[in-house]
């Protein structure tokens, strides 16, 4: 469900540039994401998608331009403030990045123990609820991550991200490495997360089926080496259905190459 038209901005990029030495990754990138919006950031490898996510949570700063969280620049904030800001985000990594020495339950509880003073019985209740939400049975809680399939590890990562009740969910290639059936399970969970709580959802992905299933808006970045010096790096900003029928051949080729008939089915439901 799209947010209200007058929903306040939660994240803003204003003429953002990012260099690594002499290599420019982002050039003059501007967009606004409103509270409660669900947005996919797509594009070929090397176009700056992951850098964009890192800028959102203050893991790096723009070379020029500004990134705003709730209307205030992220750059220049103290480490203490950045730590508080990052607790507002839930991050689902491309690889689950679980602690192999800890049980599933302790992985999900990790952020709660590090960042809250909740008693253990309340932490245990939250862990149980989050595992239930992502469709994992109680028996999984005592297992180690190495005992789980890739799809189950993804679900544990999602449960951990949800444990601290984030305002903004960031998904970095959430279906990479999964078969179509498990990809559909993860896509459905992303939808359920949005349905159950007021949350802003940002998905970085190559999977256009995920785009068609889980978001209302698509932003496409294009690799700078293949753009003219005066061309904008954002070459598309619209709905998934509009992306599928976009007249720009660069958008059309990417979208159809990634999803084909499956995206058409999703976009025209």
Question: Where are the regions that the model predicts?
Answer:
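Catalytic Walker B motif of ABC-type/P-loop ATPase nucleotide-binding domains
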Residues: 169-172
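Conserved ABC ATPase "signature" region
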Residues: 73, 120-139
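Conserved ABC ATPase signature
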Residues: 144-148, 152
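Short coil-to-helix segment of the ABC ATPase nucleotide-binding domain corresponding to the Q-loop/switch region
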Residues: 102-110
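Conserved catalytic motifs of ABC-family nucleotide-binding domains
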Residues: 165
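Helix-to-loop junction immediately C-terminal to a conserved catalytic motif
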Residues: 57
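ABC ATPase NBD coupling module
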Residues: 74-90, 114, 120, 243-246
């Amino acid at each position: 469900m799209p947010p209200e038209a007058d929903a306040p901005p939660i994240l803003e990029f204003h003429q953002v540039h990012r260099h690594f030495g002499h290599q420019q990754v982002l050039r003059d990138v501007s967009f606004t994401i409103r509270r409660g919006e669900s947005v996919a950031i797509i594009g070929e490898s090397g176009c700056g998608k992951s850098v964009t996510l890192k800028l959102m949570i203050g893991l790096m700063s723009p070379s020029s331009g500004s990134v705003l969280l709730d209307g205030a620049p992220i750059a220049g904030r103290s480490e203490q403030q950045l730590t508080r800001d990052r607790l507002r985000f839930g991050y689902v990594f491309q690889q689950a990045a679980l602690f192999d020495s800890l049980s599933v339950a302790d992985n999900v509880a990790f952020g709660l123990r590090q960042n809250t003073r909740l008693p253990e019985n309340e932490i245990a209740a939250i862990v149980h609820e989050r595992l239930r939400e992502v469709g994992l049975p109680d028996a999984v809680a005592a297992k180690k991550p190495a005992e789980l399939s890739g799809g189950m590890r993804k679900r544990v990562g999602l449960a951990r991200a949800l444990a601290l009740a984030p305002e903004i969910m960031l998904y970095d290639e959430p279906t990479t490495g999964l078969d179509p059936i498990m990809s559909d399970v993860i896509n459905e969970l992303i939808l359920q997360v949005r349905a159950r709580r007021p949350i802003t959802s940002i998905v970085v992905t190559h999977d256009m089926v995920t785009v068609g299933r889980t978001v209302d808006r698509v932003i496409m970045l294009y690799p700078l080496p293949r753009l003219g010096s005066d061309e904008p790096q954002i070459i598309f900003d619209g709905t998934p259905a509009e992306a599928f029928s976009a007249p720009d051949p660069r958008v059309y080729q990417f979208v159809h190459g990634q999803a084909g008939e499956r995206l058409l089915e999703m976009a025209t439901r």
